Curated annotation (Swiss-Prot):
This is Zinc finger protein 341. Keywords: Disease variant, DNA-binding, Metal-binding, Nucleus, Repeat, Transcription, Transcription regulation, Zinc, Zinc-finger. One of its GO terms (biological process) is regulation of DNA-templated transcription. Residues 408-422 have a biased composition (Low complexity). The lineage of its organism: Eukaryota, Metazoa, Chordata, Craniata, Vertebrata. Binds DNA and to the STAT3 promoter. The gene is ZNF341. Transmembrane segments: none annotated. It is linked to Hyper-IgE syndrome 3, autosomal recessive, with recurrent infections: An immunologic disorder characterized by skin bacterial infections in particular with Staphylococcus aureus, susceptibility to fungal infections such as chronic mucocutaneous candidiasis, atopic dermatitis, recurrent respiratory infections, bronchiectasis, and increased serum IgE and IgG. Immunologic work-up shows impaired differentiation of CD4+ T cells into T-helper 17 cells, decreased memory B cells, and often decreased NK cells. GO terms for molecular function: DNA binding; DNA-binding transcription activator activity; DNA-binding transcription factor activity, RNA polymerase II-specific; RNA polymerase II cis-regulatory region sequence-specific DNA binding; zinc ion binding. The keyword DNA damage does not apply. Its main location: nucleus.
Length: 854
């Protein structure tokens, strides 16, 4: 196969001959009709800037093929230190051709121009791969000679050639005007019949670089020498003649053997071993080694990574790495470096003209300008539907449905209807209602710029991004409320207010009269950014609607645009913000879609219905970890846990005015207590003239009229409206209390002191035995007054009158009222009576029945 090359160039040494023979036999790049070969897919690789021809002995590399062949003729020295390269430029492309000969010659261009060589610095390509992407030097030499011998051959006209799998360095060239063609060479013998050609090769080129003319690169092929055609080749600047055969000493220098394949890394100027040898050589059926090549995608990625690391070979200066003086980061552009340095210094050279806020990047100023845009004044209202409350008539008799629809009662209410609109239709006409009215609540969110409606606020907020162009720039001056749709007119208007404007630092809050003074001040925060004042998390609240804002400017804009007037369309209530109105609207509706099957209540969400179901089941899954209380709802447990806190956070706000020192653990208790200071008692009892400030207190009072108490004493059957009152109740009639009374009796009888005569001598007279339980009941029963006609008799005593007998002159009676820990009207405690009394004393419990006067 290589005989044609050996006959054309007889001056090659044995090393070159062995390399060429092993290449042609092993890689199977050229079809051999006499031997078996393995067809490897053509490797597509990006092209470097120039072709490189490497000498096998002295390792010199050349960019020009004639200069390389001249070097081979002059018997190069292996120890030459200098490496010279010559550049080869082309101005056309190779036409495709193919032939089934032993050696396939590369197609030649119609016109070729070779420039003079230049000297470049030594290239890192002094070593080549054994089985990698870059071939050994002798392989490059073989391909170069094959291309050189094909320069004098005519241009064929035939099918596309088979691209050699040899990975040669090619140079892209731009098409220029071709010179006039030279005279045709002598005819050559015709080639043998061609074989079916494989698919044509794809265009080669570096990633991202266009190839003019489709294939404007110098490509080296192994093609047949004798080809028919009329193409001519003209070589300028170098007169090239056939070289005579050279005698080379029969010495073969074995190339170095690498244990593992190496990959050339252009960026690091060196070689590095591969990993687990991904490109291991394959063994053919004949026992030869077939070189394997990386996939085109792998080659393209590798070339792209190392394209910037070949400054010597490409002839371009290497980009200088700009290193940050504060850290170890490097940048290729000065612009990126300067922006990075600002992160260390805190410098912010770009200021907003409207508010003076400084930024490190100009793009951030443009983003910040969007914060000065507001919605137009006419579209800053609420998102509540105008017909949020509607009344729909539902017919109980389907035959009368058409008549009810004709009345128009199902239409939305035009104004603010009265609460009477909820009354069932047909009740006034007869006892049986034939239709009923259902109040429907529209809780959707309405867009102010289009008729779209959304079920949640987040959907509306996402939709409003489509109307961003509706926003306008508003003047920052308080007295000027002008708006501008364009930024240019807004900035021109701001300049007219420069004498009136004051600028506030967003870091420390200081005000400055001019934009320049603010900019100078902001550099003080940039000197030591790590010690700059921390941005306070101050929250600015609106006193009317309790909305929170992060800046005073935002709060001021809210006060200027918000109406704080949101009336309910169904009643006369007015709310300061929209969310309060939305929370109030469901109170007019049917309650929701989810109905409880036990109590027939409606709920807006299924989750609320599930929580409500615990009330009917009696299940209390939420238990207190401190006490034994259990609750059927989690919020009730959370509210209950407040009573276990050691400090009461909610204090009466009128303590400085009225001296009220009451404190509470729960906010709802404080709210109820505040109403007691107003003096307004709107809840009146229908059975008596009492009135209460809370509805719950009225309900407790009404149980006293009906006798339906929640809590009753087991001993005396007295009823209480609260558990606290039952706990404080001192029952004298219960069996346990009677046992305690018997155990506390004195062991001996004592006589009551009695003064006799004027001497004041005390005489002890025996007291009767303490009244037993049955006697006390009989005594109490005898004191029950007669029932007044027309009024129910008293069922139980309202109080117990404790009478202290003997011992103390100043002792008075004590009236014990249920619910009060201390007695009423007693100026001495029982312990003081027992300690200060000279004689014995006894306590008599007398039931007292109190009847209110007419």
């Amino acid at each position: 196969m290589a005989q044609a090359i050996f006959e054309a160039l007889e001056g090659m040494d044995n090393q070159t001959v062995l390399a060429v023979q092993s290449l042609l036999d092993g890689q199977g790049a050229v079809p051999d009709p006499t031997g078996q070969s393995v067809n490897a897919p053509p490797a597509i690789q990006p092209l470097d800037d120039e072709d490189v021809f490497l000498c096998g002995k002295c390792k010199k590399q050349f960019n020009s093929l004639p200069a390389f062949m001249t070097h081979k003729r002059e018997q190069c020295q292996g120890n030459a230190p200098a490496l010279a390269t010559v550049s080869l430029a082309t101005n056309s492309i190779y036409p495709p051709s193919a032939a089934p000969t032993a050696v396939q010659q590369a197609p030649t261009p119609a016109n070729r121009q070779i420039s003079t060589y230049i000297t470049v610095p030594p290239s890192p390509l002094i070593q080549t791969l054994v089985q990698g992407n870059i071939l050994v030097s002798d392989d490059v030499l073989m391909s170069a000679m094959s291309a050189f011998t094909s320069l004098d051959q005519p241009m064929p006209q035939g099918p596309p050639p088979v691209q050699s799998s040899l990975n040669m360095h090619s140079v892209p060239s731009y098409l220029t005007q071709p010179p006039p063609p030279p005279p045709p060479p002598p005819p050559l013998p015709p080639p043998p019949p061609p074989q079916p050609p494989p698919p044509p090769p794809q265009s080669l080129g570096p990633p991202g670089r266009p190839n003019p003319g489709g294939n404007g690169v110098v490509e080296v092929y192994s093609a047949a020498a004798p080809l028919a055609g009329s193409g001519t080749v003209e070589i300028q600047a170098l007169g090239m003649q056939p070289y005579p055969p050279l005698e080379v000493p029969n010495q073969c220098v074995e190339p170095p053997v690498y244990p593992t394949p190496t990959v050339y890394s252009p960026g690091k100027q060196g070689f590095k071993p591969k990993g687990p040898n991904p490109a291991a050589p394959m063994t053919s059926a004949t026992g030869g080694t077939v070189a394997t090549f990386d996939s085109p995608a792998t080659l393209k990625t590798r070339r792209a990574k190392g394209a910037r690391g070949l400054p010597e070979a490409a002839g371009k200066p290497k980009a200088q790495k700009l290193k940050c003086s504060y850290c170890d980061k490097s940048f290729t552009k000065n612009f990126d470096l300067q922006q990075h340095i600002r992160s260390h210094t805190g410098e912010k050279p770009f200021q907003c003209i409207a508010c003076g806020r400084a930024f490190a990047q100009k793009s951030n100023v443009k983003k910040h300008m969007q914060t000065h845009k507001v919605w137009p004044p006419g579209h800053s209202g609420g998102t509540v539907s105008r017909n949020s409350v509607t009344v729909q008539v539902m017919a109980l008799n389907p035959s009368r449905q058409e008549d009810e629809e004709s009345t128009g009662l199902g239409q939305p209410l035009p104004g603010a209807p009265q609460p009477q609109a909820l009354s069932t239709a047909g009740e006034e006409e007869g006892d049986k209602p034939e239709s009923k009215q259902v109040v429907l609540i529209d809780s959707s969110y309405l867009c102010q710029f289009c008729p779209s409606k959304f079920s949640t606020y987040f959907q509306l907020k996402s939709h409003m991004t489509q109307h961003k162009n509706e926003q306008v720039y508003k003047c920052v001056v308080k007295s000027c409320a002008q708006t501008f749709p364009k930024l240019d007119t807004f900035l021109e208007h701001i300049k007219s207010h420069q004498e009136e404007l004051s600028y506030r630092c967003h870091l420390c809050g200081k005000d400055f009269p001019s934009l320049y003074d603010l900019g100078v001040h902001q550099y003080s925060h940039s000197l030591l950014p790590q010690h700059s004042p921390k941005k306070d998390n101050a929250v600015y609240k609106c006193v009317k609607c309790v909305n929170k804002y992060s800046t005073p400017e935002a709060l001021e804009h809210h006060l200027q645009t918000a109406t704080h007037n949101f009336p309910c369309p169904h009643c006369q209530k007015v709310f300061p913000c929209e969310r309060y109105l939305r929370r109030h609207l469901p109170t007019h509706g049917s309650g929701g879609r989810f109905k409880c099957q036990v109590c027939k209540k409606f709920f807006r969400r299924e989750h609320y219905l599930k929580l409500h179901a615990h009330i009917h089941s009696g299940e209390k899954p939420y238990k207190c970890s401190v006490c034994e209380s259990a609750f059927n709802r989690k919020d009730k447990l959370k509210r209950h846990m407040l009573i276990h806190e050691p400090f009461k956070k909610y204090k009466c706000p009128f303590s400085t005015h009225t001296g009220c020192s009451k404190e509470f653990n729960r906010p709802d208790k404080l709210k109820a207590h505040i109403l007691s200071h107003s003096g307004m008692k709107l809840h009146k009892c229908a059975l008596c003239s009492k009135s209460f400030s809370r509805r719950a207190h009225l309900a407790e009072h009404q149980r006293a009229h009906t006798g339906n108490y929640k809590f009753r004493c087991a001993g005396c059957a007295k009823g209480f409206s609260r558990h606290k009152y039952l706990k404080d109740h001192r029952c004298r009639l219960g069996p346990q209390k009677d046992k305690d009374l018997q155990t506390r009796r004195p062991p001996q009888r004592r006589a009551a002191p009695r003064s006799c005569g004027s001497g004041g001598r005390k005489v002890l007279t025996p007291l009767p035995d303490p009244l037993g339980l049955e006697e006390l009941k009989d005594t109490g029963a005898g004191l029950v007054p007669e029932a007044v006609p027309g009024k129910p008799p008293f069922a139980e005593p309202d109080a117990v009158l404790s009478i202290v007998v003997g011992g103390a002159v100043g002792a008075e009676t004590e009236l014990v009222v249920p619910g009060h820990a201390e007695g009423l009207g007693s100026n001495l405690a029982l312990a003081e009576l027992q300690a200060g009394a000279e004689g014995p004393c006894a306590m008599l419990a007398v039931p007292v029945y109190i009847q209110a006067s007419e």
